[in-house]
Amino acid sequence: MAKEALPSIYDYTLDELKEILKPSFRAKQVYNWLYKKYASSYDEMKNLPKELVEDLKENYPIDIMQIVKKEQSRDGSIKYLFKLRDNHTVEAVLLLMKDKKIDEDGQIVRSEKYTVCISSQVGCKVGCSFCLTAKGGFVRNLTVGEYIAQIVNIKRDNDIAENKALNIVYMGMGEPLDNFDNFTKAVEIFSELDGLAISRRRQTVSTSGIATKIKKLGEKDLQIQLAISLHAVDDELRSELIPMNKAYNIASIIQAVKAFPVDTRKKVMFEYLVIKDKNDSIEAAKKLVSLLNGIQAKVNLIYFNPYPGTSYQRPQEKDMLKFKDFLNQKGVICTIRESKGLDISAACGQLKEKEANGNS
């Protein structure tokens, strides 16, 4: 079998590795090197016998993803372009947030909080009219290992301590629920205590609204957070923005969300990309309040981030504030997402497009 076709070491849960590697305690040693020390080669794994190292090199590739380009924003955000074994590329973004907590002495402690937005597919089938990723069409699903390697590469590149809290958002290139089996297995591997130990409650899946898959995800009860890319309050506009809405309309999505098991401490996030003169009116806000009636919801308003060639425009700040204030007055928790990476190619597909066009 060609090396590029072999499963990666990152494709396996700890229990699966215990079945493969003998004696089974070797699996935990390998996991420790992969996810606690972020080893980039088997030669670094000094407590493994030479025969095992050679077997791992031959049959379980570790170097499945390379950083080919990255851009750092003034706000600390970093956009990554990764090259895969078949030379396709995907993007991920490290978002750096400022966190403020009160310690046991009542003192304010300031720290940094990390969120990583990762991709699920090379390209995308959904074809959203506002998204640059759609321009390239769909190529393939990411493997389980390619999900995992995005986080490992970013933690290694930024020397993020193994015990540093980190949030994962499945909101990069592609539709995660269209890659259901690989996505859900990645959730499992990310959360393994002997591995990266990223709590499932720190993982959020963002979907364009495949109602049947939302139902299926709810039945698995993975205890992850759900975010819906809604972006419109009527089917006509949503079908323009997200053509898949013709198959899964707003009513079917809302029905699936109402059946989704939600942690009582959390809410279902509804992402609403605000586009000037498209969906930024108070009339739209009124319809949104009505749609979300009976749902434990939070609305996250997002400024449209323009890219070359799009006809859509960024909304005015005053209209965003009016929209937010109206929802809050009606009892719907609403925030405006802090824009990150405005001075870099932070929107999905932008860095990939720049690299393809040979731009620096």
Curated annotation (Swiss-Prot):
The active site is at residues 91, 348. Signal peptide: none annotated. It catalyses: adenosine(2503) in 23S rRNA + 2 reduced [2Fe-2S]-[ferredoxin] + 2 S-adenosyl-L-methionine = 2-methyladenosine(2503) in 23S rRNA + 5'-deoxyadenosine + L-methionine + 2 oxidized [2Fe-2S]-[ferredoxin] + S-adenosyl-L-homocysteine; adenosine(37) in tRNA + 2 reduced [2Fe-2S]-[ferredoxin] + 2 S-adenosyl-L-methionine = 2-methyladenosine(37) in tRNA + 5'-deoxyadenosine + L-methionine + 2 oxidized [2Fe-2S]-[ferredoxin] + S-adenosyl-L-homocysteine. Pfam families: Radical_SAM (PF04055), RlmN_N (PF21016). Binds 1 [4Fe-4S] cluster. The cluster is coordinated with 3 cysteines and an exchangeable S-adenosyl-L-methionine. [4Fe-4S] cluster binds at residues 124, 128, 131. Residues 110-343 form the Radical SAM core domain. It is an enzyme of class 2 (transferase). Disulfide bonds join 117-348. Its main location: cytoplasm. GO terms for biological process: rRNA base methylation; tRNA methylation. Keywords: 4Fe-4S, Cytoplasm, Disulfide bond, Iron, Iron-sulfur, Metal-binding, Methyltransferase, rRNA processing, S-adenosyl-L-methionine, Transferase, tRNA processing. S-adenosyl-L-methionine binds at residues 174-175, 206, 229-231, 305. Its cofactor is [4Fe-4S] cluster. GO terms for cellular component: cytoplasm. One of its GO terms (molecular function) is rRNA (adenine(2503)-C2-)-methyltransferase activity. Specifically methylates position 2 of adenine 2503 in 23S rRNA and position 2 of adenine 37 in tRNAs. m2A2503 modification seems to play a crucial role in the proofreading step occurring at the peptidyl transferase center and thus would serve to optimize ribosomal fidelity. Reaction proceeds by a ping-pong mechanism involving intermediate methylation of a conserved cysteine residue. Belongs to the radical SAM superfamily. RlmN family. HAMAP family: RNA_methyltr_RlmN. This is Dual-specificity RNA methyltransferase RlmN. It comes from Aliarcobacter butzleri (strain RM4018) (Arcobacter butzleri). The lineage of its organism: Bacteria, Pseudomonadati, Campylobacterota, Epsilonproteobacteria, Campylobacterales. The gene is rlmN.
